[in-house]
Amino acid sequence: MWTHPINYDVIVVGAGHAGCEAAFCSAKMGASVLILTSNLDTIAKLSCNPAVGGIGKGHIVREIDALGGIMAEVTDQSGIQFRILNQTKGPAVRAPRAQVDKQMYHIHMKRLLESTPGLHIMQGTVESLLDNENVIQGVTTKEGITYLGKTVILSSGTFMRGLIHIGDLNFPGGRLGDPAATGLSAALKERGFPISRLKTGTPPRLLASSIDFSVAEEQPGDPGVGFVHRDEPFVPPLPQVSCYITHTTQKTKDIIAANISRSALYGGRIEGIGPRYCPSIEDKIVKFADKERHHIFIEPEGIYTQEVYVNGLSTSMPFDVQYNMIRSVHGLENAIITRPAYAIEYDYVHGNVIYPTLESKIVEGLFLCGQINGTTGYEEAAAQGLIAGINAVNKVLKKPAFIPSRQESYIGVMLDDLTTQVLDEPYRMFTGRAEHRLLLRQDNACLRLSHYGRDLGLLSQERYEIFENQKQIIEDEKARLNKTFKKYGNSVVSLAKALCRPEVSYDILRETFPDDVRDLGSTLNASLEMEIKYAGYIDRQKSLIHSLSKSENMVIPEDIDYQSISSLSLEAREKLAKFTPRTIGSASRISGIACADIQVLMVAVKKHAHQ
């Protein structure tokens, strides 16, 4: 075993979406960083759908950009269709989504990492961890190399003891075509990490030239929509394409029903629990038996390939059933499968042994991010990578930890949920997980979080000043519209009051009063409209947050003895000792902790402070 001569500040294990974000931000903050991956040709590979964003997820990508991360930038560079979802619904649930060229996404990310000062990329498979008295020292690889590091970030995705299922066939793999990582799970178990299994899956890929698109509904993109916050209109650098919508048939249902026992999921061969909101097609047929058909979305995988992703047909059926099932779908009667669908089981670590910083409670200096923490999705993984990278560097530099709150970001919501809840399925972000989602809109992420990005050294002063200028423009224009009165309909009202009417949009107001209503650009126009239209709701949510903040942010001492607080219920004592929450707010969100327990805990914390 040879020891590499460099002692890195941060070693990142895995170069998926979590690992790439962790490595980039660590290096950007001035750390010496090594990222290890079993295959340099699969950096930032989009293993499942060729898309970034969506409801809740798109909000997270915007937050990553506001903090100085890179997912938004790489998505904009490689996007081949951009849309805003839920445009007819309220502003809190509107979200950007992009189809991306899978190869271009990998190329742009790899190029960006390679050109980042202080960041070294190395091909190697990590087999074990090095630690001394529960303090991380480095890692060893299958290739016989020891790498020393002050901190280590594990971002192993679905590779830890990954097991692929296609019908009654199963074999080890991190994803189809890539080997599983077997050593890491054993290394974590040896150190007392609680580990369980989760499951996810992916649909077959088809050859576009074999599909009859004439019977499918075309779904084009929206112009001018990107993920990076910018002060000029967004023009995608790649050619833009359409997606298509088709549907299953009665024949599809019959094929699945006749072969349900051959599914790895329903045949009892899978122990891991899959994502509730991304079910397999056999799951949908069984659980929604009364539904005549299910939508299928045909999504291009890139502009230089004929392969398409068939969203909605994830399955663990054997290949012969997949073949017949695909050809029963409207427009896919002659479809050629290029890659089979499969399910995959993998190991994950329980959240009660992880701090909200994503540092483990068992081995100091060891951070975990992405699917190893029980999440599903590229966006959730990237956000965790960003947080893990920031806090790894802060630990090395002996700086305070960075934990965004759930009141100011979806990233904060996720961190709090992962470390206070017992997961019984893969965790996916939705806007409904946030208590104050009207304040956490995708359009105002830069206004909420950019000061953190600047202070951390991830966001340039120039970009920060652009965001601050945008914030000031919105505030100034809001004040001006509140002071400008015009006759509108049968009465004289302020232009802000006129904009509050349901039938009046900012564009309509501009057309009606062109000399009094400024065109700030589509992004700022939309933000200003939301700030004015929903001002009452926004003010109420801000007031609620302010009233709760004193108790929410009350810090619980690390050395508090829950067992000695006799007024706590037995369940509360057990749960608090298990999760060791850092604040009263986090404690209040642990399942099984009653309001009465929180009141008792607050008294105990105050008493502890005076001892």
From Swiss-Prot:
Family annotation (InterPro entries): FAD/NAD-bd_sf, GIDA_C_N, MnmG, MnmG-rel, MnmG-rel_CS, MnmG_C, MnmG_C_subdom, MnmG_C_subdom_sf
Source superkingdom: Bacteria
UniProt key word tRNA processing: yes
Entry keywords, A to Z: Cytoplasm, FAD, Flavoprotein, NAD, tRNA processing
Residues where FAD binds: 14-19
SUPFAM superfamilies documented for this protein: FAD/NAD(P)-binding domain
GO BP annotations, alphabetical order: tRNA methylation; tRNA wobble uridine modification
Localization: Cytoplasm
One of the Pfam families matching this protein, by short name: GIDA_C_1st
A molecular-function term among this protein's GO annotations: flavin adenine dinucleotide binding
Annotated Gene Ontology cellular component terms: cytosol
Cofactor dependence: FAD
Oligomeric and partner information: Homodimer. Heterotetramer of two MnmE and two MnmG subunits.
Similarity field: Belongs to the MnmG family.
Functional note: NAD-binding protein involved in the addition of a carboxymethylaminomethyl (cmnm) group at the wobble position (U34) of certain tRNAs, forming tRNA-cmnm(5)s(2)U34.
The name this protein goes by in its record: tRNA uridine 5-carboxymethylaminomethyl modification enzyme MnmG
Organism: Chlamydia caviae (strain ATCC VR-813 / DSM 19441 / 03DC25 / GPIC)
Gene: mnmG
